[in-house]
Amino acid sequence: MRLTRVGAIAASAVFVFAACSPAPGGSAAASGGAAGAQPEVCKNKKGTSANTINVYSSLPRQGTNTEQTDTLVEQIKETLDGQVVGAFTIKYFDLDDSSAAAGGDWDGAVEQANANKVAADPDAMVYIGTYNSGAAKLSIPILNAACIVMISPANTYPGLTKEVAGVTQPGEPTTYYPGGYRNYARVIATDDAQGAAGAEWAKSMGKTKAYVLDDTQTYGHGLAASWAIHANKIGIEVVSPNKTTEGFDAKSTDYAAVAQKIKASGADVIYIGSITGQNTGKLWKDLRAAMPDIKIMSGDGVFEKAWYDGAGEAGNGTYLTFGGVGPDQLTGAGKEWVDAYKAAHDDNLPATYTAYGNASATVALNAIKNAAVPNDRWEVLKGVMGTKDLDSVVGKVTFDANGDAVGGSITAYEVKTAWPPEFVSVLSVKE
């Protein structure tokens, strides 16, 4: 069954996230032009097949990640595979960028190999991925050199597209675009927005002193640093070293010493930037053992049942943010999509990123359909980067000049006594 692709989410100004509301259909048009003048690397990049266009995804397909990526892949395949555009049929290929050696998480060598494989396929037009921001750092430059557009349903690290003081690294994002043009877009909010929204939420709960931790990966560090920066601005005292985030060792077997240090700091809230696979279950358990009543807050990197299964009862009372709209909060046509999904999946809700996988595929399909030459990489790239007011299951998608989604929402949830967490509110942040 091919599910409806129309949904809605209200756009808002930067750092002001409004509640979601439906749009009545709307157009599915997207116009190119945001990519600028055609660079040399994008000349003569027409596919060689007379009847096939290839679209790839590169996502972690092992370990705890499958809770999200199984449904992401399902939606991408359902939206794209077998679609006919003029003389061409779209073929979709599901690539795994994880490995057993990396514990089922993304593996840099595998991600690079995936990007190189796709770059070498003359009929490849779109690369959907990555799931992890650190992986995107490796593949964006490879695909940029090959004039292949990349659309991420889940990358949230700001440095992939823009410079954010105190969060991004020197040279970012320019270093990822050796061809001097942009070939990367994402349909999800960035961590500077999510972190700031989370800090505002903590302030609204009366929290005054915070200890901030991260898993030292690109996503976790960026989100935690963003939270700490905004917390300092709004009067929450950040008591972790240097008033910023502190990395924890994901390979540690005991976080009791970390917990005692935090307890001694007098913090009344702990913020953790991490993905599930970074030993988060053990970390939560040790923190709760030392501080049963302390508030713990985190982001969408642990917004999955696998995290809760690992943390057990220690996960109860955790506050979570998601850089988008959770499936339980989509309205109008978006809710119709959720209802259809549930009907086909034993009444189970989609995972948090499922709708954003669908939206990424919708952007890709729209660009291919509207390209002057649908099997020309530059024409497809222009269509993606110039996406404007495109209806999708998460609402109207528009990309700015950096490739970031315009507007959006940050939603807040609380884990009470079981999974899934309960919706609290749509968060607002004003700088």
Go through each PLM region and give its residues.
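Short, low-complexity disordered leader/linker segments with a strong preference
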Residues: 1-54, 85, 429-431
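Extracellular/periplasmic periplasmic-binding protein-like sensory domains
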Residues: 284-358, 416-429
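Periplasmic-binding protein-like
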Residues: 57, 118-131, 149-154, 209-214, ...
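Segments of small-molecule ligand-sensing domains
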Residues: 343-354, 365-420
